[in-house]
Amino acid sequence: MTLQYFSDETVNFRTPAEPREGEPFTVRFRVLKGLETTVSLHLTADGEASSREMKPVREEGIYVFWEAEAEGVRDKAEYYFITAAEDGTVWYYGKNGLSQMAAEVQPFTVLPHFSVPEWARGAVWYQIFPDRFANGDPSNDPVDGEYTDATGVPCRHAAWDEPVTAGDFNCFYGGDFQGIIDHLDYLKELGTDVIYLNPVFVSPSSHKYNTQDYEHADPHFGVIVKDAEGADRYGIRTTSKENLEASDALLAKLIEGAHSRGMRVVLDGVFNHCGDFHKWMDRYGLYRKYTGEVGAWWDSECRSSRFFRYLGYHEYESWWNNETLPKLNLDGSKELREEIFRIAEKWVSPPFNADGWRLDVAADVAHSPEANHAFWKEFRQHVRAARPDALILAEHYGDASSWLSGDEWDSVMNYDAFMDPVSLFLTGMDKHSNGYDPEEEGDGALFWDRYSKASARLPQQSLQTALNELDNHDHSRFLSRTNHTAGRLGPLGPGEAEKGVSKAILRAAVVMQMTLPGAPGIYYGDEAGLCGFTDPDNRRPFPWGKEDTVLQDFYLNAVRLHKNIPVFRDGSLVPVIMDDDLAVYGRFLGKEAALVVIHIGTEPARLRIDLSDVTGAAPHAVTRVLHSSTLACSLGRKNVPTPMGTVDLNLLPQSAEIYVW
């Protein structure tokens, strides 16, 4: 498709792309040559609206670029473009494209005080679920029956390759910090920039979203110096000073090891709720017995009783009515808020020096939107004061724009503008494998509609740092979605998640992950060929010694392309063809450009693409740097002449290709 009008928030169309307070900036608007129109800029700066004429300043191939200057702003600017044809037709252009009414326009934004860490833009993430990545120290492994709680008795899997079971939430494989340390070189070789660790603080579960102690790393991941037998084992292991200090030191060593290899580490912050084991609640009396601390379960007048909302005797507000997850009363206790801020500062400060926080269910924190926003504003101030380049990334489903103005979150886990539209287009499956819709699969126009609307809600800073994952600990493995099997582990069994999967479709997904705007995130084991339904089956142990090495090599090279081709980090994105079984898009930065072709049909297809649709000026030749299909996979470079400015493609089934010029 040849776009008649185009602009965005990249450096291609705004200079500087992110103006600071009071800094003048230039905006540009691209118009198809031959359209008889005038263009004006409608600007609202610090609440004051104005309009000004734009001027055509240069031509590039089939396009004319119009420009206007804007004065610096103090707090915020919004703008959109107005085109007026000779026949009186008026169009309005904003982040959501063309509109016939000004009220429908989603304006471009300038946020002078919104600064995200430079290292996070386009960074390649690797997410690790610690219990399932690697067991580097069997001496710290949980044992069968180490404790008993409302969810049952924990178990230790006898073998690393034992299948996950439906009731696996309290079962352990023994993965730990030492296992991660032992494989830091593997992560570096893969191209990892950021290691994202699922929760690592003291907790009785394998997932550790039911925090027991925010102050310390879990000794089952760290070091057990002091141990006991029988009923005292869990209490001694998780409350003794020797174990906690040694485990904290090992986590610091892990982070230091990552830093020495040029990688960052982001921790998982679960501040909406804690666990009923937490010393502030202490439902099972561990801290009362082993440290002398008294929790709210035992004393309704103790300091931490105000950290929860009580509904009656031993009845408290919990997250989704799960009694093992008491909800923290953050808007009702200033003391609790200060505790959380101190904890957040602690882990991004020496000697730990974590590089930021991923925030669990961040929109659920507190009990009102006002209290939620107030909390995250304070949280950001504390974390950035402790570490100015710390990243604050939220788990969020839906429109996050109200948190993305520069004083709360930096960005989000990108469900709306990546995981959802990509999964539905490539597989017809939702991210939980709850159902298969053949009408969704391969609908390129619907994919682009979903993607463009969701990405338009993100400021450019947030879009570049949004975590683009195909799957994670909460959702089915992408590779399993390719077989169109809807269901869960319990009824179906683990084998059904592995039957008839398409690694060609997975490779196409990886190509999209590495070439669309944002920060691509690899969930541990995806690169090795792990399958699995949604949790707990998506948390299978990493298959060390049984990896799909061909797939690993593909990931490694796709990551290199993402990192070595600047347009994939900073460039503009334009749709070229969005049709049945096709998603073709271009990225460009100045005169450098790339074309990405995704064809998921099961039959070969022929396609002619006019390359001037990307940048305006068509090249005389392009270089293919990646090709993948059901029949072949090539990561070598191949020069392709384009004497007429077009490229003729013979697309193999379920193929993905990248061309650069």
Model-predicted regions and their roles:
Residues 1-122, 126:
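Glycan-association/targeting regions that enable binding to alpha-glucans and other polysaccharides
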Residues 16, 26-28, 576-616:
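Carbohydrate-binding surface patches
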Residues 29, 128, 187, 197, ...:
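Conserved, mostly hydrophobic/aromatic
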Residues 33, 124, 639-661:
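C-terminal beta-strand-rich structural cap/linker in extracellular carbohydrate-active enzymes
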Residues 130-193, 200-351, 379, 385, ...:
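Substrate-binding/active-site clefts of carbohydrate-active enzymes
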Residues 130-132, 195-207, 268-278, 360-365, ...:
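Short, solvent-exposed turn/loop segments enriched in Gly/Ser/Thr/Pro and often Arg
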Residues 543-576:
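Aromatic- and carboxylate-lined catalytic core of secreted/periplasmic carbohydrate-active enzymes
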